[in-house]
Amino acid sequence: MRITGEMGNLAAWEKRLFYMCSARPTLHPRALFSDVTSDYRNPAEPVPGDEVTIRLRTGRYNVDKAYLVVDNVEHVMTRVRSESMFDYYEAKINVGTDKIYYYFKVELGRTVCYYNQIGAIKDLNPYYNFQITPGFKTPEWAKGAVMYQIFVDRFYNGDKSNDVLDDEYNYIGEHVCQVKDWNKYPAQMGIREFYGGDLKGVLDKLDYLEELGIEVIYFNPLFVSPSNHKYDIQDYDYIDPHFGVIAHDEGEVLKEGDTDNTHATRYINRVTRKSNLEASNEFFAKVVQEIHARGMKVIIDGVFNHCGSFNKWLDKEHIYRDSTDEYAPGAFERYESPYHNFFKFYSNQWPDNNSYDGWWGHDTLPKLNYEGSKELEEYILSIGRKWVSAPYNVDGWRLDVAADLGYSPEYNHYFWKRFREEVKKANPDAIILAEHYGDSYEWLQGDEWDTIMNYDAFMEPVTWFLTGMEKHSDEARPDSYGNPDYFFGAMHHNMARMGGQSVAISMNELSNHDHSRFLTRTNRTVGRTNTLGPEAANNNVNKAVFKEAVVMQMTLPGAPTVYYGDEAGVCGFTDPDNRRTYPWGHEDTELIDFHRAAIKMHKENDVLRKGSYKSLYSAYNVVAYGRFTSDDAAIIIVNNNDDEVRARIPAWEVGLGFDDDVEQLLVTFEGGYSTDRLGYHLQNGWLDIGLRKTSAVVLHKMKW
């Protein structure tokens, strides 16, 4: 009250001076930034013995002190550079062999703020500290690389002589069949249906993939297997001749009503005869060689948690027993089999012991018993080496259900450590990429996997935000639809848990062989083919929303991965409907042209491949984020509303100056897209922009 009374007697200028002198300084937390790119950690992937420079960005003259806190010890940082809006602080640390955990602390007057992987925070949470793992290096070629996933049987039939024949063998109780109509939808129980796609078909379409802008081809399983998906491997040493070459083709198919595969002599000859197997391997080596000649890489699928009941080690169907080439007896038939300890049997009911352990109880997917067999462990490790070595020289492995391998967490981690050692020894630049749902932190510590299929920090948050749908189309959640807090919260949490090195090469897919096609998710319809029928997957889809998703795919951190046919407008509920054939001759050419333009933009702007990432703006159904480096910046804005909106974006947060200009690289909207260059002028570091309904726009720093 005394101050109030005295203030009443002061002149106006004296009051202003009083307030200026007594006001607390204001810290600008949105100006704080650091990450694990080379702009803020150099070297970004240090090895033991390196001196590492750690940087922190702050607002210009906006902090009194900045500290790098390493393992809870504060190190004063030095201001080394100033720009119009920012100061940059540095500290140097020496790296040994142990992991290093760090965060930042800044002080301004009595205000204290911390900064870690999820941004500026008031209270510490070591869960999100930055981490240095000495010696953890990820393949440079994979950072931001544009990948393309091919489910081979459904891509293109380039060689009809290797097609699966009607009644060629019996699979899960019924004869297999050859689908004569390429455009037929997969049947609900279509595991016995074969469309005829093969590696010759991929070879024939390499021009298309190259023109699309693809840099990496990821193949679903290629090894010998009785299914069309081939996640039940029969022989890890050979490419399936139905995908490769059948050099010698003789024998009989099954007669009607016959379910005994020992009578399936045509199949036995095709998949067990060494001349066919070796010819298929040779052809695959030529395919990889041609892909490499075009500057592209190859990733193959490794299914090492389980094999198939047809596998030569188990030989439940007795097809190897009757082969013209010599094979050891399978563990299903004889206790004395050299492969007996490759599986876990629960009884001694030989011959034909059906008590083996199946993955999740599936008798067609015998779980491999690594803990019981050193021979099995060494064999699979040799497979890991074989395919990344000459003459095949593939560029990495995608690991199916990798966290399930073995019977204990301890063995699982032990095996993947050995697998990494062996694969990297054979091909140091090979990528090890795992399928995983949930927190992958414990496997991404530099000695097991390089990265993962990015469900948690890409597919799921993008799907929930743009469609409100679960990734199988099994559930709709209105509370997640258009919810920017959920979107950015999920992104920041999961990216932090993965770590920047792994995020940069993670497989960012909108669709794949396990989930509904993203274009189908845009109809926001809960269902599957067995409840709604396949046509329902095509109804009321929204191409404008799909294009928004593709823009996000091409601009968020990671390796954008196109599932074959997505770019051509293929729809589908979850498997098997998501495995429809590529619609050659019936493509959505406008969508293909759009993908080509989006991929071109991604590849031509290095800031979109390797730049830092920062969230900038959020509102209902609207998000904006930036990608930036020390000398470049891009802003991406998505408006998923059915109405036009205006947004005011803090472009200064990604280093754009107060009077900079930005130009439009790509904009999508209902009915199309445009790559016309359109300029915008910033006002005091802010971008005021009108957004079309259901649109996405990519803006880039204009360079003069």
Where are these regions (language model features)?
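Short glycine/proline- and charge-enriched loop/turn segments
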Residues: 232-240, 268, 363, 529-533, ...
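Carbohydrate-interacting/catalytic domains
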Residues: 1-151, 157, 165, 200-215, ...
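Active-site-proximal loop/turn and secondary-structure-junction residues that shape catalytic pockets
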Residues: 223, 304-308, 403-405, 438, ...
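Active-site cleft segment of glycoside hydrolase catalytic domains centered on the general acid/base Glu
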Residues: 366-374, 401-420
